[in-house]
Amino acid sequence: VLLYHRVADTGYDPQQLCVSPENFEKQLKYLKRHYHFINVEEFNHHLNTNKAFPKNALLINFDDGYADNLLNALPILEAKNLQSVFYIATANLNTNHLFWWDELDEIFRNKEAINNQVLIRLLKTYGLSNPEQLYAFLLTALKTAGSLSVRNDLLEKIRQLGTINSDLSPYRCLTYHELKQLAASRSAVI
C-alpha cells in the first residue's frame, strides 16, 4: 500500500505531505512500469483468501480528505485507469477548519506575523536556538500528545505565536458535494 496525503503545489510543505500534480503523474508512470496495480476488490480477495499477492502488487491510498484529492489526484488516476482508496477525516468536511498539523505549518509559514516575544520565551523554555528547532519540537509534541485535551491545550499555547493567513484554500478539505463527486468515480473507493 502506497500512502499519499495531498497532490498540490503549496509552496510551503515542511512535513512533505504534498506531491505536485506533475510529480504525481510521473510517479504513477514509473510505478505502472515497475509494479502491478491492484484495486480494492483484488486486495480484499487476496487478504481474505490468504492467497499470495501478485509480485510487486500495489494499492494506492489517500489519507485525510483534502479537496486537492478530488481536484488534482482524481483526474490523473482516472486518466491512467487506476483506483485508489480515500480515507476521509469527516470532522473537517464542509468546514474551514484546519488539521492541527496544517495550523502549525501556517503559523510558522507566516513568519512576519510571529510574535517575537512568545517565540523567544518558547525557545528559552525548551532550550532551542531557532524557529526551525521549535517547529520540529512542537510537531513532535503534538504528534505524541497523549489525549485530545493535551493536544488542544498545546495548540492554544502555539496559537499565541502568531496568526494564520486568511486564505486557507490550500488546506481546504472536501465539501459534502465534492465527497459525492469523488465517490461517484470508478477510480475512487471511500
Region spans (language model):
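Catalytic alpha-helical scaffold of carbohydrate-active enzymes acting on polysaccharides/glycoconjugates
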Residues: V1-I190
